[in-house]
Amino acid sequence: MSTNKKINLTEFLNQQYLCECLTVREIETLLEFTDEVTFAKGEIIADVGEVGEALYFVVSGEAALVHPEEGGGSLELAHANEGEMLGSMSFFDREPRSIRIVAVKANTKLLRLRRIMYQRLRIEHPFIAVNLLEDAIVSLDRLFRRVTQDVATYSKYLYGGKR
């Protein structure tokens, strides 16, 4: 990774919830454990049935969490924007993915933290790893709240007000 790119990523991460308790040096350390990957619009980042072997952080662009439907269509469940984490459920519980993660915009850039690097990070830099876990919890909480609100809205639409 070039020096300019590393500086830009450090500045970007320094503004994100994930790194709000980390020093610049700790952010630079985190970057040493990740690699940057780029996806084209519509490209699959992670697919249904795979066990998550990496965590992803959206640097630029956007990704969608979609559930493939029979017959080729798909139901979009949520979006992940800059600064958000992707792939934490399957990564931590090691169960096959139940949704597909797809790049929504061209040149969607993600930081990828592979499992083997996370295991090293956890041992060598536990404070950074704890911050990742907290961010995963917050990300899942946000997703759960969004989905819950959507279900409530659809339920009200389908069944009307109070029964």
Summary of predicted features, one role per range:
Residues 1-163:
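Cytosolic regulatory regions built on CNB/CRP/Popeye-like sensor folds
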